[in-house]
């Protein structure tokens, strides 16, 4: 699997993420699932799929019996809506900025093929020093992402919900 990751990532600089999935009933049939760094939603273009497929086809790259098929990871869209409740002496704008920086960092790190979005991670990212309470309105629960998908955040709306 690591060799396929290496050759897929080396094929083109636009390859962002890669998962290698082997079918239980036919372990020689491999799905090479990639995402694209410069596409709007992370899905790979047909051109990139062909470039990576060509890079994996030569027999010196793969075992003779392996049959790798390059596929695009499918974007699983979600949005984040949250309210932050601050202390009486807190500087709202600074706390909001810090929470937004941390949630954007989490979104970038989580944009991996097969990476689920966990509410606990969202709470952790949003709960910066000075925030008393975080209420996440969306997503309502964990977002389960399978090996053929990657999470794609379409919008974030983080606001100050009040003073406590």
Give a label for each model feature:
Residues 1-115:
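Carbohydrate-recognition loop of C-type lectin domains
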Residues 95-164:
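An aromatic-glycine-centered, glycine-rich loop/turn in mixed alpha/beta architecture
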């Amino acid at each position: 699997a690591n060799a396929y990751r290496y050759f897929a990532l080396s094929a083109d600089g636009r390859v962002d993420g890669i998962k290698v999935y082997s079918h239980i009933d036919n372990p020689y049939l491999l799905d090479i699932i990639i995402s694209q760094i410069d596409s709007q939603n992370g899905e790979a273009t047909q051109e990139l799929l062909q470039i990576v497929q060509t890079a994996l086809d030569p027999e010196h790259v793969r075992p003779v019996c392996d049959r790798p098929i390059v596929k695009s990871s499918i974007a699983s869209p979600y949005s984040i809506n949250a309210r932050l409740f601050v202390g009486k002496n807190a500087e709202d704008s600074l706390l909001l900025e810090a929470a937004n920086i941390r949630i954007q960092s989490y979104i970038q790190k989580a944009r991996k093929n097969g990476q689920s979005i966990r509410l606990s991670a969202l709470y952790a990212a949003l709960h910066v020093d000075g925030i008393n309470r975080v209420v996440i309105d969306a997503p309502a629960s964990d977002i389960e992402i399978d090996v053929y998908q990657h999470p794609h955040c379409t919008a974030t709306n983080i606001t100050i919900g009040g003073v406590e």
